[in-house]
Curated annotation (Swiss-Prot):
Name this protein carries in UniProt: Maintenance of ploidy protein mob2
Record lineage: Eukaryota, Fungi, Dikarya, Ascomycota, Taphrinomycotina
Region Disordered: start-end pairs: 14-45
Ranges annotated as biased composition (Low complexity): 23-39
Organism of origin: Schizosaccharomyces pombe (strain 972 / ATCC 24843)
Name of the gene encoding the protein in the UniProt record: mob2
Domain of life: Eukaryota
Family of this protein: Belongs to the MOB1/phocein family.
GO MF annotation list: protein kinase activator activity
SMART domains, A to Z: Mob1_phocein
Entry GO CC: cell cortex; cell division site; cell tip; cytoplasm; nucleus
Principal subcellular localization: cytoplasm
One Pfam family per UniProt: Mob1_phocein
Biological processes annotated in GO: cell division; RAM/MOR signaling; regulation of establishment or maintenance of bipolar cell polarity regulating cell shape; signal transduction
């Protein structure tokens, strides 16, 4: 909660415009049908030696708002239903990510990010209604993802909030799809906008948030290694530092 509250002053000025965009995106024809809500990872070009990413350099990589290992706070408490615990945490993590993107939306534009990239040779494509992969500017891709997730979170058939409504039998499968898309936003922000994160002095918040996100994903096996490839080096560092 402290993490979310500490962002409130920064996001207040940006939220109105971005949530209008989110509303427009979620109501666009066919954009968020079950058929078109997936996307693909595309490796572009040939492997090459890249300079060390800014987010992997000292002192930034060891800068955290929260000290200690997040595994202690993500594990399932006794007597708590697994689906309830996962639903609560995914909802909160999505809320935090939404607030962070309110800040970053100013920097993530069609001009600065014409494709949704996560590394020099990693681009994400969106699958349209005909299952055809299409390249989208990063802000459009992210708006689509956020709106799609928000629709899922407010679907009583997927995330029930009323007494007596059960979780669907494929609930964890749905959550994995949501988690994968959330990871892609993290990957793009680390790759394309870490300089802006530093400029806003948000690296401690962002690094701790990512460590929390990864720790929860590992605890409940919500991410595959293939999905986390763009940030695998950072995840190894976080493991070695005892953050996750």
């Amino acid at each position: 909660m402290f993490l979310l509250n500490s962002l409130s002053r920064i996001t207040r000025g940006n939220r109105s415009k971005r949530h209008q965009n989110l509303s427009d995106a979620s109501s666009s024809s066919g954009s968020f049908s079950k058929k078109s809500s997936t996307s693909q990872l595309v490796r572009t070009g040939s492997p090459s030696v890249e300079p060390t990413a800014l987010y992997l350099q000292q002192p930034f990589v060891r800068t955290h708002l929260v000290k200690g290992n997040f595994s202690t706070i993500v594990s399932l408490p006794r007597f708590v239903d697994l689906d309830e615990w996962v639903a609560l945490n995914v909802y909160e993590l999505f809320t935090y990510l939404n607030h962070f993107y309110d800040v970053f939306a100013t920097f993530c534009t069609v001009k600065t990010c014409p494709v949704m990239s996560a590394a020099a040779n990693f681009d994400y494509t969106w699958l349209d209604n005909n299952r055809k992969p299409v390249h989208l500017p990063a802000p459009q891709y992210i708006e689509y993802v956020l709106a799609w997730i928000e629709n899922r979170l407010h679907d009583q058939n997927v995330f029930p909030t009323k007494a007596g409504l059960p979780f669907p039998s494929n609930f964890l499968v749905i959550v994995k799809a949501i988690y994968k898309q959330m990871f892609r936003i993290f990957a793009h922000m680390y790759y394309a906008h870490y300089a802006e994160i530093l400029h806003l002095s948000l690296e401690a918040h962002w690094n701790s948030f990512f460590a929390h996100f990864i720790a929860f994903g590992k605890e409940f096996q919500l991410l595959d290694k293939r999905d986390t490839a763009p940030l695998k080096d950072l995840i190894v560092v976080l493991e070695n530092q005892g953050n996750i």
